[in-house]
Amino acid sequence: MSESVGNIRIDPRDTIFAKIISGAIPSKKFYDDEYCIAIEDINPQAPVHLLVIPKLAVGGLSDVANVDLEKYKESMGHIMSKIHHIASLKGADSYRLVINEGVLGQQSVRWLHIHILGGRQMNWPPG
């Protein structure tokens, strides 16, 4: 469940997202259910830039083998079924979903999360 960055081990339960989910750090959650929360990104890359954060502690896609697969599938299935609703709460009816994985993938918080980017024309390649 943890990842090495240099000699440092990162446990998702020690991340800012774990603290936001637990309420230890205040946040402006605009969506909250049994499986996830949604917040606005503090460094938006589009007019609408949302983070959908599962409540299940998974560091990233490479850590899926280390968690209860049935709980993971239930959680992620639910989240994917709610993405359009969550995006629409902030006025995005067209959007791009992004999951960053690992250091080279620019994952800045070692807790699996989904970016919803919208509110403008998305270009390809994304860069």
From Swiss-Prot:
Q: Where are the transmembrane segments?
A: none
Molecular function GO terms recorded: hydrolase activity
Q: May I have one GO cellular component term?
A: phagocytic vesicle
Q: Which GO terms describe its biological process?
A: response to bacterium
Q: Which residues form the HIT domain?
A: 16-127
InterPro entries the record matches: Histidine_triad_CS, Histidine_triad_HIT, HIT-like, HIT-like_sf
Pfam families linked: HIT
Q: Which domain of life is it from?
A: Eukaryota
| The protein's name | Protein pkiA
- Organism, per UniProt? Dictyostelium discoideum (Social amoeba)
Gene name on record?
Answer: pkiA
